[in-house]
């Protein structure tokens, strides 16, 4: 047992040195450093679902907010760098409902203008506590295109088709014509070199051609050469 105590001493010293030279000590976090909705107030328990939603244009989306407090709850929407705006119910499109501790926001026939971050805010009994859900839900509307965007896309498609056609002509048709021209050139060169190397001075004239002299016939007329 003594050996175990002695062997553990260097480890303790090493740990102490690491803690000493690792950096300045960080003070403990106090309750004042926590966000307002995490300080244990009655409004601290707020959950929102889902965290992200991507929907097609003209479809429907629902956001749910759960709370353990009975105070009034309001929905807000934040677009980009703008300030959050309170949502106002629209008959047949934006509907806010409550079922016990569950608050539901329903948006029908969503459009591109509905993009943004949605979150709920609850007013507690205490006058100094207004808690906003820190996470919220981001809505992304898909499939929205204006007339100008469609025109630009069609122009881009036409340009891509034209470029592809030019590339096909450049890399397929042009090499074929080059190969055909090369074959025609080879055939012409072979025809041109038919009499190449023939020297006219070395050719024989008609006077140099030896006349054919036939020898005397050994057989008589009417006698077959194969007969003795």
UniProtKB/Swiss-Prot annotation:
Keywords: Adaptive immunity, Cell membrane, Disulfide bond, Glycoprotein, Immunity, Immunoglobulin domain, Membrane, Phosphoprotein, Receptor, Signal, Transmembrane, Transmembrane helix. Phosphorylated on tyrosine upon B-cell activation by SRC-type Tyr-kinases such as BLK, LYN and SYK. Residues 1-25 form the signal peptide. Residues 181-228 are cytoplasmic. CDD domains: IgV_CD79b_beta. Pfam families: ITAM, V-set. Residues 184-212 form the ITAM domain. Glycans are attached at residues 68, 99, 130. InterPro entries: Ig-like_dom, Ig-like_dom_sf, Ig-like_fold, Ig_sub, Ig_V-set, Phos_immunorcpt_sig_ITAM. This is B-cell antigen receptor complex-associated protein beta chain. It comes from Mus musculus (Mouse). The lineage of its organism: Eukaryota, Metazoa, Chordata, Craniata, Vertebrata.
């Amino acid at each position: 047992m003594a050996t175990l105590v002695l062997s553990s001493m260097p480890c303790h010293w090493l740990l102490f040195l690491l803690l000493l030279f690792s950096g300045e000590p960080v003070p403990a976090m106090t309750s004042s450093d926590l966000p307002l909705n995490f300080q244990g107030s009655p409004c601290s328990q707020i959950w929102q679902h889902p965290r992200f939603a991507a929907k097609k244009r003209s479809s429907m989306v629902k956001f749910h907010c759960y709370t353990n407090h009975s105070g009034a709850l309001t929905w807000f929407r934040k677009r980009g760098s703008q300030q959050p705006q309170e949502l106002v119910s629209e008959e047949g499109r934006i509907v806010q409902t409550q079922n016990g501790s569950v608050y539901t926001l329903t948006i029908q026939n969503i459009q591109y203008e509905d993009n943004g971050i949605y979150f709920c805010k609850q007013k507690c009994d205490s006058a100094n506590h207004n808690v906003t859900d820190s996470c919220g839900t981001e809505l992304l509307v898909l499939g929205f295109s204006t007339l100008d965007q469609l025109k630009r896309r069609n122009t881009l498609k036409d340009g891509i088709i034209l470029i592809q056609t030019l590339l096909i002509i450049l890399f397929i048709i042009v090499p074929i014509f080059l190969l055909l021209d090369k074959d025609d050139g080879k055939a012409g060169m072979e025809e041109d070199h038919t009499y190449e190397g023939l020297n006219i001075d070395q050719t024989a004239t008609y006077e140099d051609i030896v006349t054919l002299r036939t020898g005397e016939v050994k057989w008589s007329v009417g006698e077959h050469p194969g007969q003795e």
